[in-house]
Amino acid sequence: MTTDSPTSRTSLLDVVAARTGKAPAAPRERRTRPLTGTAQHPLVLLAGGPKVGKSYALAAASADRRVARLAVVEVGGDQGAMDAYGAIPGARAELVEHDGTWADITAAIQAECAAEPTPGGLNVLAIDGATSLWAVLSREAQRGGRDLGPGGWAAVNSTWADFLTVLRTFPGPVVLTARVDGETIVDDALGRIRTQRDLAFETDVVVQATGHRRFTLAGARSLALSDVAESGPVELGDLVLADLFELLGADEAGAE
C-alpha cells in the first residue's frame, strides 16, 4: 500500500481549481485574540400573555434615573399602547416612528443603533413587540399567496438573524417583548412564545410574566446571574428593568 507524501497530496482547493479553471485564492492570515472578560450589551426577551404589564415595565424603566434614554419601536397591534404610560411620573420613553413595513421598521432600528448615545446613563432600545414584527416579515414574504417552501423560509429566517445582528450593535441593552400562547407557565412557556422559533435561544436573558406585573427570570446567559439562575426560575415580582440591567453589568458592557 502506498500513501501520498505531504508534498504530493491533492488538496480540496486544488480539486476546485482544476474543475473551475480558477487558481485557488491565497490563504488568508488568521488571527486570534484573548477573551476580554467583558459582557456584551444584553438582548432581553420579555415574554408573557396579553395585558400583563410588558409595555408598562418598559415605560417605567424610562423614568429610572439610571436610564438616560429609552427608545421604543411599537409594531402592529402593539402600536399606541405606550402613549397611555406617558402619565407615569418621570416617564421619558420616546416612540420611534415608522410606516409599518419591514423595510422601514428595520431602517428605523438601524438608525437608532447608529445614533450617538445620550450621555448620563443607560441607553435602552425596546421592540414592542417581536411577535408582531415576525408576523410582518412572514406576511410580506408570503405576499400574493406565495408558497415559500423550505428554501424560502430559510431565507426568511436568515433575514431575521441579520436583524438580530443589527440589534447587537446598539450601544446599550435591547428588550424585545413577545406574546406567549395560553397560560404563562414558566416550565414550558418557551416553546409557546409567538415569534421566530429561535428567539429565546438567541437572546441573553429570558424574563417570563407569570401574572399581572409579576415576572420571573426564566434563564440568563450571564456570569453575574449564573449562580442565581442555576437553581431554577427566579421570582422578580414587579419588574424593574434598570435593576436587571445593573445585575447584568450593562453599565459596563462594551466598555473599552
Located regions from the model:
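C-terminal regions of RecA-like/P-loop NTPase motor modules
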Residues: T2-R30, T36-P42, R213-E256
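Conserved P-loop
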Residues: A25-G121
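Residue-level signature of catalytic and energy-coupling elements of molecular machines
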Residues: V72, D128, T203
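Phosphate-binding/switch region of NTP-binding enzymes
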Residues: T165-L241
